[in-house]
């Protein structure tokens, strides 16, 4: 099969822990043709959705470990039509760019896309699960989402638990997630500013 991964730059991977690398490695082990690209490299030319791709050069023997595979991987650059792939894995880190989803809309009836484009739209951030029905509170922790600083300060002040979790709606891999303990709530103003203003990179 011809497999494409829309992802973050290859050079930024952490080989020891990156799940996308493992998918690419496994695809190569199984003999599939692999191409990678980024959101910034999607384009439309003559009404055809294309990508400036990096095509993985097939190796006579694929290294057994993802780390060695990463070190030895060689690519050749090529402009390819997205509809020419059998499968496209959407592996870009959140928050997702709606323009990328619009590009994928144009070929979703021709290519199998993982994950589904509409599913990506609906579950683009942590609001998706926070709004799910869990009347008994047995699955989803009590969750407060707001950009109203005074409201959040009242929530924190009156919270009976000794610990609370603070996290941005967007982000990935635990980025920006902290445990707020009762004894550390004196600096809550600066923490809320960090999350609400988005100064923490992926925070909002």
Per-range role (PLM):
Residues 6, 89-92, 168:
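Short, well-ordered coil/turn residues at beta-beta hairpins
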Residues 1-4:
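Extreme N-terminal starter segment of soluble prokaryotic enzymes
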Residues 12-142:
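Conserved N-proximal alpha/beta basic substrate-recognition cap immediately N-terminal to
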Residues 19-20, 149-165, 169-204:
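Phosphate-binding site of ATP-dependent enzymes
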Residues 7-11:
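Extended, domain-scale alpha-helical bundle/helix-rich regions
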Residues 143-148:
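Short acidic-hydrophobic, aromatic-tinged amphipathic segments that line or gate anion-handling sites
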